């Protein structure tokens, strides 16, 4: 087993409106479980996934944040130190797509990355299974165009309920986060090991997550 000090910690923040399926995506990816009963996330929580990428041992720490506006003031404490941000919307909910700009802007404001113009984002359009796709209101083309307006960020469509494209989406996130972590490795305060002030207390063999 890899020693703790040789593992790279990648911090990923998942953002989007309440009810788009952020927690369900994470729980499906980490635990292969889906809970039909919706329960809003309060504040923030996280799950972890152990990976090997390019012969490197990685702990992907995925932060699940509340979609309600009253919790957005908590952002700075959770966003800072992130290696990648995943924006999630519901392909059947136009409002959840239209608020992506707000989430994108708010993250950059709160996280305050060193190079905001090149900070990595990934977009996920979730709930593709609903009504066999007949309830969809945001087209694949429109989503890709939005990604193009943000510097051609990667886009994935998923169904947390059916476990469709979940592993592929998060593997893409992990590769992007690792690439960003390596890019930042020459900073004054090297990141990526288990000495980050926010995550010192984390046991990589234990993970927490919401039920929904």
From Swiss-Prot:
UniProt cross-references to Gene3D superfamilies, sorted A to Z: P-loop containing nucleotide triphosphate hydrolases
Domain of life of the source: Eukaryota
Family note: Belongs to the small GTPase superfamily. Rab family.
Motif stretch (Effector region): 38-46
InterPro entries: P-loop_NTPase, Small_GTP-bd, Small_GTPase
Species of the source: Arabidopsis thaliana
GO MF annotation: an example: GTP binding
Cell compartment(s), UniProt: Cell membrane
Lipid sites, type S-geranylgeranyl cysteine: 210, 212
Gene Ontology cellular component list: plasma membrane; vacuole
Keywords for this protein: Cell membrane, GTP-binding, Lipoprotein, Membrane, Methylation, Nucleotide-binding, Prenylation, Protein transport, Transport
Membrane found in the keyword field: yes
Membrane topology: Lipid-anchor
Protein function: Intracellular vesicle trafficking and protein transport.
Protein's name according to its UniProt entry: Ras-related protein RABG2
Family matches, as Pfam families: Ras
Gene Ontology biological process terms from the UniProt entry: protein transport
Residues where GTP binds: 16-23, 64-68, 126-129, 159-160
Modified residues (Cysteine methyl ester): 212
């Amino acid at each position: 087993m890899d020693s703790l000090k040789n593992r790279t910690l990648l911090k990923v923040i998942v953002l989007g409106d309440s009810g788009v399926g952020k927690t369900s995506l994470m729980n499906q990816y980490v635990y292969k479980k889906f809970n039909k009963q919706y329960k809003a996330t309060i504040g923030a929580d996280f799950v972890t996934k152990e990976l090997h990428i390019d012969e490197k041992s990685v702990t992907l720490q995925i932060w699940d944040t509340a979609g309600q506006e009253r919790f957005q003031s908590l952002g700075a404490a959770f966003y800072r130190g992130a290696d990648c941000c995943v924006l999630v919307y519901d392909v059947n909910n136009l409002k959840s797509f239209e608020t992506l700009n707000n989430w994108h802007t708010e993250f950059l404001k709160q996280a305050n990355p060193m190079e905001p113009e090149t900070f990595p984002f990934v977009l996920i359009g979730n709930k593709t299974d609903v009504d066999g796709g007949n309830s969809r209101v945001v087209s694949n083309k429109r989503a890709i165009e939005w990604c193009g307006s943000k510097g051609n960020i990667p886009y994935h469509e998923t169904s947390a309920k059916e476990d469709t494209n979940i592993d592929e989406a998060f593997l893409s996130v992990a590769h992007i986060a690792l690439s960003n972590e390596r890019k930042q490795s020459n900073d004054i305060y090297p990141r990526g090991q288990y000495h980050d002030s926010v995550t010192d207390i984390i046991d990589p063999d234990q993970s927490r997550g919401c039920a929904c």
